[in-house]
Amino acid sequence: MRGFDGYAPSGVVMKRVLVVGAGLHGLVTAAREHIAKNQVFVVEKRKRIGGRGTSQESFGHQLEHGPHLLLKGGELHSMVKKVSKVKPSLRPVRPSKIFVVGHGPLYPINNPKELLNVKMGKDKVREDALRLISGWGQDIPERRNALIKGKLCVVGEGWSGLVGRLASTLEEVGIPIQTGVKITDSYEGGVITSKGVKIEADVVKMCTGEPVGEAVKVSTLDVVLDNRPLKGLHGLVKDDVAILDLAAIHSVKAPGMSHFSCIALSGGVSKIEDLLDERVSGWRSHIITRRENNSITLTDSRGLLSDGMI
């Protein structure tokens, strides 16, 4: 790890900055405050850092909370590259290898007429599918364009690997991260924990993941199969359900197998299972491991994804 010392502006007065929350947003905020030559301290109410960027190991596979695609060249990618000696291993999702059920390839490069309709915005089904894959239903033009240009990527080490890189670098430069600390109140000059302990700070950054306005909930399913029924396809889309085969996109993900990372904007996990039943016959008999969330926060009224909140 290279640390942050080479990126700080000169002539800046040091402040005591407390970052509340050690998810992706909190860790990046802590890194930026250190770059600004401030004294930084991080607290997290849970026993584990990472927030929704955590993973669960099962039978040698890392299962996350549904699919995560990193915007290559975006702010998060740039920050991770700054603090790491080794660049994260990225492989792009190819929209030409995603099949829209009843419609064909998401980006029909071998059909000039259909491709022209997509480019002119005259194909609503594919337009909705592009929005689903690029922004999980959120309208984020930058990510839509990135998907078409091969700049929305699966991360070899997973989202949790990016969290780990940031946390390791913070530790290396001496920024303490204390878990199991719940903040219950604030006062002029700091905050108070649930145990009545006062923590003094000039600036408090709240990065707890609390939604702004109304939370947008989705359902996710991650499942590893011992076969490859999609035969190299990167994914499937039907209505508001998307299935990505991470193993087909990135070679380090379940080699020789399938790692389906799935999301449904409505209808729950059963909606995902219905699509798998329809298009991947017999998948249940090939399950190695699975992880599901019937309701998990995707975003809030801001419409930003996790790597867009930093």
Which residues are covered by each model-predicted region?
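Extreme N-terminal leader/targeting segments of oxidoreductases
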Residues: 1-17, 36
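Conserved flavin/dinucleotide-binding core of flavoenzymes
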Residues: 2-7, 249-310
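N-terminal Rossmann-like FAD-binding beta1-loop-alpha1 element of flavoenzymes
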Residues: 15-42
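Conserved acidic residues
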Residues: 16, 200-202, 307
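Glycine-rich FAD pyrophosphate-binding loop
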Residues: 34-58
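Dinucleotide-binding Rossmann-like beta1-alpha1 core, especially the glycine-rich loop
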Residues: 59-130
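Active-site/ligand-binding neighborhood in enzyme catalytic cores
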Residues: 103-189
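Mid-domain catalytic core of redox enzymes
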Residues: 182-275, 279
